[in-house]
Amino acid sequence: MAAVFVYLLRFLFIVIGYALAALAASLFLNLLVMSAVDLGHDEPLPVALGSMLFSVPLVALWIAYIAFFPAMLAILLGEMLGKRDWLYYALTGAVAAAIVIGFMTGTSETGHDLAADPGFALAVIASGMFGGIAYWLVAGRSAGAWRQPGRETTLPGPSGS
């Protein structure tokens, strides 16, 4: 019975971590796009915050939907291999974002393909890295701990060098 509780708790950490990673990636992407287009400079602060409060969760839903399969593959590999370093999750977030860009390429009906724009592609990859680091902060630091009951789940101490 205790093992079932451990598995359910780990699953809850994974779901919460994925949701917060999508929100973090969305916030980062929104900030990059707003700064690149110079939005928010002429608007009062409540107007700019109001648009962010609406667009960040909406874009987070889109990110969570479109990046689900590559991210779940990375999370599953991280859990099975016990990957706990932030670099693994940052790089797999970038790879998941690159896969999303690959699926987006050529799907524009208006003639202007955002996925072909290198600046937009780099912004999406950077937001994928940011989301991967956010996932690591919530759930990645204890990846694989459910498989090895004696393994330490905290961060390592100082090296002493």
Give names to the regions the model predicted.
Residues M1-S161:
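Juxtamembrane/disordered regions of integral membrane proteins
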